[in-house]
């Protein structure tokens, strides 16, 4: 009788056994493989950061925003400004998690796109989604947020980097052929997005 009462307390009068079975399977998979899935997710985001930070053409138009860019120093006791520095390599994220009041989610990459002359929403909609089929969930005035997940593959990261390089090459060609007035207009748009 006690078991029946406890069981009825935690169940429904119309349970959906397919959903319950799916939740049980998902819980078991996370228990067995969750750490590896999340580790690969973070590695995908870190490789994205490294690829953008070390590619000379991408540096010209894009910047991965770091803890130092987004979190005031008084909230970063560890003193770590970036998870990845091209000169020094990787920093110990665990130190940030242990000491800092605020940290960035290592699985998300905030990319400043104002250097392209496009605002975040235009870059998301007209460039990434319409032209290349890349889905972005969050934007700001001059940034887009890439969110990796446990399904993010190396090939999807490579495709994104390839697309960013192609966009940068097209901008280079456009600016090479631009008149002085067109270049000034581009520079004003960039300044408006990045400095004002």
Map each language-model feature to its residues.
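Conserved core segment of the aminotransferase class I/II
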Residues: 1-14, 22-34, 39, 118-127
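A short, ordered amphipathic alpha-helix with a cationic face
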Residues: 12, 16, 133-134
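Glycine-rich phosphate-binding loop plus the immediately following alpha-helix
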Residues: 19
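Non-catalytic terminal extensions of PLP-dependent enzymes
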Residues: 35-196
């Amino acid at each position: 009788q006690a078991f029946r009462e406890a069981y009825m307390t935690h169940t429904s009068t119309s349970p959906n056994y397919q959903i319950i079975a799916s939740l049980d399977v998902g819980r078991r998979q996370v228990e067995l493989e969750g750490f590896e899935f999340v580790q690969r997710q973070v590695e995908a985001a870190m490789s994205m950061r490294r690829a953008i930070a070390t590619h000379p053409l991408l540096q010209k138009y894009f910047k991965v925003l770091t803890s130092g860019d987004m979190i005031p120093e008084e909230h970063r006791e560890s003193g770590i400004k970036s998870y990845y520095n091209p000169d020094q390599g990787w920093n110990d994220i665990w130190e940030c998690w242990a000491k800092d009041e605020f940290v960035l989610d290592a699985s998300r990459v905030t990319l400043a796109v104002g250097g392209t002359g496009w605002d975040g929403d235009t870059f998301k909609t007209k460039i990434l989604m319409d032209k290349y089929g890349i889905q972005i969930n969050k934007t700001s005035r001059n940034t887009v947020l890439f969110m990796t997940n446990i399904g993010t593959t190396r090939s999807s990261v490579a495709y994104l980097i390839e697309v960013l390089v192609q966009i940068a090459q097209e901008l280079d060609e456009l600016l090479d052929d631009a008149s002085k007035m067109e270049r000034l207009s581009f520079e004003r748009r960039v300044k408006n997005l990045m400095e004002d």
